[in-house]
Amino acid sequence: MPTPVRTDIVIDRHAKDVLNLDEAARAADVLIKDGATGICLNGTFGELPSLTFEEIVDLTRAVVESVNDRVPVFAGATTLNTRDTIKRVRAFREVGAHGLNMGRPMMSAMSDIAIVQYYRDIAEEFPDMAIFLYDDMQAFKRPITTEVYAELAKIPQIVACKYRTMLVLGQPIANNYANDMRAVDGRIKLLTHEYDWWISNKLFDMDAIWSSSISMAPGPIMAMQDAILAKDYAKAEVIRADMQWASEGLFPKTGIDDWHVSKIPAMKTRIHTSGYIKCGPALPPYHVAPEERFEAGRAAGMRDREMHKKYPHKTMRQAESAMREVSTAA
């Protein structure tokens, strides 16, 4: 889930009181009503690198209260070191988070043994908190290897993983999904991006994914879920193609490295423009980028609005039905 930032203040290095907590609560509520079965906070578009400790705790509290135990909330526990992660998790537990959305320290790439020990330390310190792995090989400077997945699968609190994607807007990325799935042996759900869902479902009967797109247009995601769980991969491909159309121009022609450089402002602009979640702008230092990246985000957001019409989400249909009833009564 993206972190909603206020639009009525200047966003610069002096910005204070930046969070729109009312919108955060509303966003969590509509995501659940429109089909989300879990909420992960403070990933890339959740402003993990640009929020203060106090802001992250305030956001988590607002979302947990809004969710009210309807689905699990995984709070953003990624920090630069083990001790800061422990401090953050203690605060998350106090506000009622169900689990942790947890990458790993990234100032320097971690060795296999260090990765395993990091997760083991947190799991042993907080045996009552579920862990959702965050395997982003760009953010954390390397992927989790098959051998490490086999060791992490021995930690019972680790229940799922945001697995690195096989396709990003049509661009293939090296992956080892089949071997990693065999290594975890059903003990960790390795969740792919929605574009890859048909692959993980067809080969391993995977019944869930991670999705940023649900924060822009939940209708296509739920339509894809219905198609894939019914094993109608042809229909799922039509939906995926529509989603890729909505993302045209968002991925720089210069390649994936340039995508990562400006993805936070571009995607927050897209999400906000889509109109589903009023997520506002990115926070410093990620609030600046070449103007064409903001333009690409706005263009994709406008296409997301077209996707709302083709694949209306549940709360949209309910609102339209209520409006018709009011019109008829009048």
Q: Which residues does each predicted region cover?
A:
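C-terminal alpha-helical cap/extension of soluble enzyme domains
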Residues: M1-R6, D34, A217-A330
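Active-site beta->alpha loop and helix N-cap motifs at the rims of alpha/beta catalytic domains
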Residues: P2-P143, P284-H287, H308-S327
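Short, flexible/disordered intra-domain loops and linkers
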Residues: I11-K16, Q171-P172, F251-W259
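Conserved active-site and cofactor/substrate-binding residues in soluble primary-metabolism enzymes
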Residues: L19-D22, R26, E54, D58, ...
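Alpha-helical scaffold segments in soluble metabolic enzymes
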Residues: V30, A62, D121, E151, ...
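Secondary-structure boundary/capping signal
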Residues: V71-P72, A130, A160, I188, ...
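Catalytic alpha/beta core domains of metabolic enzymes, predominantly
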Residues: E124-E125, D136-K253
